[in-house]
């Protein structure tokens, strides 16, 4: 098995004249297939970093049960998944082929996503297959990039990190010149037709009633049912990302350009984070609309905290997060519980569950064992996912999966792919859902989906009017 050795070199420049968006606009045409990951929570030291990843060196993807690895020497390897050759083994094997030394090597890792559909590789869950002839998206894709631009918003610092192989010349001067360039191409965005959904409001309400019936029968305690929307468009979808990050700032902002398609969004929810030997899950369960009036919003948050249906849902999903972490962790505890957090269109109840990794626990396996999030599937998780496959008329694709970073040391930070667009073939696909329990009401659940979609639909409207 071949290995690839790199040294990470870095250069620090003053960052007070730059933003992640301004730099991304300058470099994206020169470095196609790039990724942008931001945090809007600049006030907290722990969430004060944003990243731009440029120039793919290598990647690992899984599609239709085949693992495809591409390497810096332009070689490719394909191997089918088997009972012994699992996604976990493939990922660990791929990571082990890269050795990186030098300063800031911790940001040199894999940036990418795992779709909800990938659950079929981890559990016996049927998934409706659908593939795009022109721009098919793998069920899972993680990319190693040559350059990482790191923004430290807390310190106003910009660090350019480059992975260099032996004998390679630095490309940092060209990258720095691109960043300092005052000019960049600008493109418009427009919608070319009305937004549509594969199912009507009444059909979604009927699906909700099916979910309630399964809860009443005791098949599940809770099930998350979602609905997809499609918006045809022309032009530059990055304007939709810019609008969304402005309307709905979140801890996880991301724009991944994978060539034939793009995945971008503004997620409030940590799927799984592993750092310094501890794993974290931040379940969000319990949602109400936001009015923008401070007094009314506080009253709505208090009503949410007192709502028996929302409380039952939240308790269930905190327990599920504890169970998921307990598979590979000890000292599992709840760090904060049912904290109201305010977003542009909604108020969420959020908890944080953490566990100490067992000695010898594999970090990738720990991540996979938490997938998908209970807040996007239900409880018990496997039965809920089986019912989702029966009830929802389409597969979920990226929605409900996760997106983020996996370090070469296995430490990772993954957001749940919600409040997210998938852009492909001049269509924006977006989706939202809600947790169904025995006490749910179909009309309320329909309204909850509309509340969650509010920021996405508003972002499309705003993007049309962005002039530069």
Question: Where on the chain are the PLM-derived regions?
Answer:
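Extended alpha-helical targeting/anchoring segments
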Residues: 1-468
């Amino acid at each position: 098995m071949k290995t690839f050795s790199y040294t990470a070199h870095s250069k620090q420049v003053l960052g007070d004249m730059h933003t992640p968006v301004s730099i991304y606009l300058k470099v994206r045409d020169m470095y196609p297939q790039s990724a942008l990951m931001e945090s809007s929570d600049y006030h907290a030291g722990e969430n004060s970093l944003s990243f731009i990843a440029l120039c793919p060196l290598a990647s690992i993807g899984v599609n239709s049960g085949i693992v495809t690895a591409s390497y810096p020497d332009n070689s490719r390897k394909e191997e089918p998944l088997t009972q012994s050759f699992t996604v976990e083994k493939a990922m660990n094997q791929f990571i082990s082929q890269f050795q990186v030394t030098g300063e800031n090597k911790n940001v040199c890792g894999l940036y990418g996503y795992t779709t909800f559909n990938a659950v079929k590789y981890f559990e016996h869950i049927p998934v409706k297959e659908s593939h795009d002839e022109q721009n098919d998206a793998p069920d899972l894709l993680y990319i190693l990039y040559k350059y990482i631009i790191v923004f430290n918003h807390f310190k106003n610092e910009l660090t350019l990190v480059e992975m260099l192989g032996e004998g390679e010349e630095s490309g940092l001067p060209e990258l720095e010149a691109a960043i300092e360039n005052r000019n960049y191409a600008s493109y418009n965005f427009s919608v070319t037709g009305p937004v549509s959904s594969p199912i009507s409001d009444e059909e979604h309400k009927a699906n909700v009633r099916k979910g309630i019936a399964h809860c009443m029968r005791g098949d599940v305690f809770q099930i998350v049912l979602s609905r997809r929307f499609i918006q045809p468009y022309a032009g530059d979808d990055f304007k939709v990302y810019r609008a969304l990050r402005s309307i709905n700032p979140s801890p996880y902002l991301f724009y991944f350009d994978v060539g034939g398609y793009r995945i971008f969004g503004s997620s409030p929810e940590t799927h799984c984070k592993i750092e310094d030997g501890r794993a974290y899950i931040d379940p969000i369960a319990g949602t109400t609309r936001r009015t923008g009036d401070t007094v009314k919003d506080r009253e709505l948050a208090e009503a949410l905290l007192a709502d028996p249906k929302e409380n039952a849902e939240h308790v269930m999903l905190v327990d599920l997060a504890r169970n998921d972490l307990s598979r590979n962790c000890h000292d599992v505890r709840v760090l904060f519980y049912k904290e109201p957090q305010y977003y542009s269109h909604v108020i969420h109840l959020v908890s944080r569950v953490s566990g100490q990794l067992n000695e010898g626990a594999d970090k990738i396996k720990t991540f996979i064992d938490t997938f998908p999030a209970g807040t996007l599937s239900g409880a018990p998780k496997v039965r809920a996912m089986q019912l989702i496959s029966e009830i929802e008329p389409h597969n979920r694709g990226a929605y409900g999966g996760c997106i983020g970073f996996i370090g070469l040391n296995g430490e990772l930070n993954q957001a749940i792919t919600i409040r997210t667009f998938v852009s492909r073939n001049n269509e924006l696909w977006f989706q939202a859902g809600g947790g169904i329990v025995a006490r749910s009401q179909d009309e309320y659940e329909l309204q909850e989906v509309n509340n969650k979609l509010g920021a996405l639909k508003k972002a499309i409207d705003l993007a049309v009017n962005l002039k530069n």
